[in-house]
Amino acid sequence: MADIMDIKSILYTEKSLGLQEKGVLVVQTAQNMTKNQLKEVFKTYFGFEPLKINSLKQEGKVKRFRGKLGQRKSFKKFYVKVPEGASIVALGA
């Protein structure tokens, strides 16, 4: 079973802040986490079930560093539709 420690952070970008007004939370997680595991984490630790969950894997960008190619880390993020009136105090949202 997934643990709350598998949720790395809440993403705060222009897009995610706009989505928060509509009740959607953008969460960065461990790469092997699934939608069902994330749903269980929200039920267990926050006391509500998300209305909808969308996921995507974002590949790390290839960047040059001192003339050599490197790659940023890849990560997985979820768009979580939160029910009205639910709050996520433990993660700072």
UniProtKB/Swiss-Prot annotation:
Q: Which Pfam families match?
A: Ribosomal_L23
Protein transport: is it a keyword of this entry? no
A GO MF term: rRNA binding
Which key words are in the record?
Ribonucleoprotein, Ribosomal protein, RNA-binding, rRNA-binding
Q: Which InterPro entries match?
A: Nucleotide-bd_a/b_plait_sf (IPR012677), Ribosomal_uL23-like (IPR013025), Ribosomal_uL23/eL15/eS24_sf (IPR012678)
- Which intervals of the chain form a coiled coil? none
Instruction: Provide a GO CC annotation, any one.
Output: ribonucleoprotein complex
Q: Name one GO biological process term.
A: translation
> Which SUPFAM superfamilies does this one have?
Ribosomal proteins S24e, L23 and L15e (SSF54189)
Identify its protein family: Belongs to the universal ribosomal protein uL23 family.
Q: Which NCBIfam families does the UniProt entry name for this protein?
A: PRK05738.2-2
Q: What does this protein do?
A: One of the early assembly proteins it binds 23S rRNA. One of the proteins that surrounds the polypeptide exit tunnel on the outside of the ribosome. Forms the main docking site for trigger factor binding to the ribosome.
Q: How does it assemble?
A: Part of the 50S ribosomal subunit. Contacts protein L29, and trigger factor when it is bound to the ribosome.
Q: What is this protein called?
A: Large ribosomal subunit protein uL23
**Where does this protein come from, organism-wise?**
Helicobacter acinonychis (strain Sheeba)
